[in-house]
Amino acid sequence: MRQFVIDGKTVSDDSPAYVTAEIGHNHGHDIEKAVAMIKSAAGVGADAVKFQTRSPKHTYQASTDRGAFYCRSDNPQWMDQVYGIHREKLEFSWDEWVAVRDEARKEGITFFSTPFDFPSLELLEKLGVPAYKVASGDATNIPLIKAIAETGKPTIISTGGCNIEEVDQLYESFKRINADPKDLAILQCSCVYPATDEAMN
């Protein structure tokens, strides 16, 4: 029987659905909002809350040119900012991440995150997250996938936009390092927002 184990909970064909509340960056770097989202997710019975973790200085070019990399937003908080600066303002400090993790523990809900780069993976390791999620955009980022596999932790990888050869490559790259079948879940992902009913499982 196929099984995936995350934070001590087994997910299989015979188990109830594992529900993850995707918080991402919807907190807008507001710790009180993040805490409220965690409480809400726990209150409705979600199994986990998932965030996104980036190190914008390692991910985005520090360009000040107006144009494609500028935020176009009606929100005065973000209007006319370089995208990298905008992303940086969304990131929590170490102390804030600790507060987020501790709040999830207090509420009895699993906390994990999607690392978008190596510094973020290192930060999440220090926080002691029990699992990782890889975004579709990084499904072909084999160095990052290998680094995550080396943690020995359960990993969920979305494959939106990938062809079957790329899915095979990420699978083989992960399994060469972490061969435990209970540590890898691959999601078929439709990169259409919002997805039509016909595109969903």
PLM feature spans:
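Catalytic cores and adjacent flexible loops of soluble metabolic enzymes
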Residues: 1-201
